[in-house]
Amino acid sequence: MKRTIILFIALFGLVISASATGKGDARFTQRDVDRFNEVMSAVSADRDLPMDELIVKVARQFLGTPYVAGTLEQEPERLTVNLRETDCILFVEMCLALALTAKDDEPSFNSYIDRLATLRYRDGVVDGYTSRLHYTSEWIVQGGVNGFFKEVTKECGGSPLAQKFSFMSTHPSSYKQLSNSPANVSKIRSVEQDLQSRSYWYIPKASLAACAKNIRSGDIIAFTSTVAGLDIAHIGIALRQGDTLTFIHASTSADKVIINPTPLTQYISGVKSQSGVRVIRINK
């Protein structure tokens, strides 16, 4: 794919804009390119592993990476690539895109960019703020349609979830791209209505201990929210250490990517804003 590379100096360092057909302009720095190459080199010997094992290998490369919220909230809307700092969903998305790219015969940063766009934006097309998949449930649906993974919550022992979607459209002041844009709010409301028409499952906190045996290392764990109208409160990558099930995540309390020091069941029992989990299994 032909890309036009434009380099310019900004206050925070070197920024590169890659013009990609159908993807809009990608925003990243030379440090992101260097970090990509470091990770590809580190996991090159593991590229033939099943995806659930490979994504854990990739995730370990980012232990200690600073937690920073809001890195995508720049205007105009462009595909932002940031391997230097992350939040919870971007960490999982980044690890999945990197693991997929590592399996290429010749992994390239351009291929990584394309995969990020396919995961993050509706139909892989950057077309303004509302084209981004803001609700994790839509991210899960699209990733399933594209063959990256399959939700297995029901098969893991889950229960029906009466999930409502309304938080973004009813709290526009919480989002600068919605606060003064009735048109954007209307588009988000349409997304919410579509998501509302689907069926959902979750493993409630009280059932997690019994169902945990069905969760594998490398599964994506999405923590369901107790906030009205909001689907997912947090997300990470499951990790089995002996008989213990924990997870790797970008932690707000630790301010960095960590292997959670307590088991999954113990972690969620102490978080009032989380009602249970959904389980997404990466295709091999």
Residue ranges, per PLM feature:
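Positively charged n-region of N-terminal signal peptides that target proteins for export
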Residues: M1-T4
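Bacterial N-terminal signal peptides
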Residues: L7-V15
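Beta-rich nucleic-acid/ligand-interaction surfaces
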Residues: D114-T118, S207-K213
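Cationic-aromatic interfacial patches
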Residues: T21-E93
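Short alpha-helix capping/helix-loop boundary micro-motifs
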Residues: Y200-C211, S225
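C-terminal soluble interaction/assembly domains
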Residues: R216-K284
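Sec/Tat signal peptide C-region and signal peptidase I cleavage site
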Residues: I16-A20
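Acidic/His-rich structured neighborhood in mature extracellular/periplasmic domains
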Residues: F62-Q196, R240, H249-T252
